[in-house]
Regions:
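A sequence-level detector for short glycine-anchored, His/Arg-bearing signature motifs
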Residues: 1
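Conserved segment of the helicase C-terminal RecA-like domain
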Residues: 4-5
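C-terminal catalytic or substrate-handling cores of phosphate/nucleotide-
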Residues: 9-172
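C-terminal accessory/interaction regions of large nucleic acid-associated machines
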Residues: 155-206
Length: 206
């Protein structure tokens, strides 16, 4: 039996991804599985790291762009991490204002909202606002400030939260306007007591 093996070595990530895509066309590998390797997400990971650089260790958050990316670092707790799945879900809920769609698999969300999400011309601050607010909401549920009943309605609470603080609609095609919107959300979210009061309002509205 003759077995032919081809070894391809490259430092070009885009080329590597193209090769893997081509090789796996015959396998059940969704195009969306490569989303996290796009430059947008690499840039966003660095953006998150830059924003939280001066935060206390407890308040820092981390974008786990690759599966188990931070598993070898015991100083980073699970509750400080968010992934592509979380980001896609709650961006659809908070920014696109479609919380009823947020429970769907990220492959569906990425495919169906590809013209509205993870675009290279988008400001990264609104994505950070989504992630930080999501993890803050998780914390409030974990610490029993918000009852577990609302676990299944997190997407709805996040949408209401963003609308209360930022306004009815965000223009992601206008960087200055989008950043202003995100800053309004983050100004409250950075203050845990203020975030609690706002989520109380969200629950009353809900």
């Amino acid at each position: 039996i003759t077995l032919v093996i081809k070894i391809i070595s490259t430092n070009n990530n885009e080329l590597s991804n193209d090769i893997v895509r081509g090789t796996n066309r015959q396998n059940i590998v969704m195009e969306e599985a490569f989303e996290g390797t796009r430059q947008f997400h690499k840039n966003f990971e660095q953006f998150v790291n830059n924003v939280v650089a001066d935060f206390s260790d407890k308040e820092k958050i981390y974008y786990e762009r690759r599966s188990k990316q931070y598993s070898d670092n015991p100083n980073i707790k699970q509750y400080q991490k968010f992934n592509l799945h979380n980001l896609a879900q709650f961006y659809v809920a908070a920014i696109l204002q479609k919380p009823h769609k947020a429970h769907l698999h990220e492959s569906y969300l990425i495919k169906n909202y590809k013209t509205s999400m993870f675009l290279d011309n988008h400001s990264q601050l609104p994505y950070f606002a989504v992630a930080y607010t999501f993890l803050t909401l998780e914390r409030l549920i974990r610490e029993h400030f918000i009852t577990k009943y609302f676990i299944k309605y997190k997407a709805h609470l996040l949408m209401i939260y963003f609308r209360l603080l930022g306004g009815k609609q965000i223009d992601m095609n206008n960087e200055r306007s989008a950043d202003k919107y995100a800053d309004k959300v983050l100004k409250t979210t950075y203050n845990l007591e203020a975030a609690k009061k706002t989520f109380e309002q969200c629950i009353e509205i809900f």
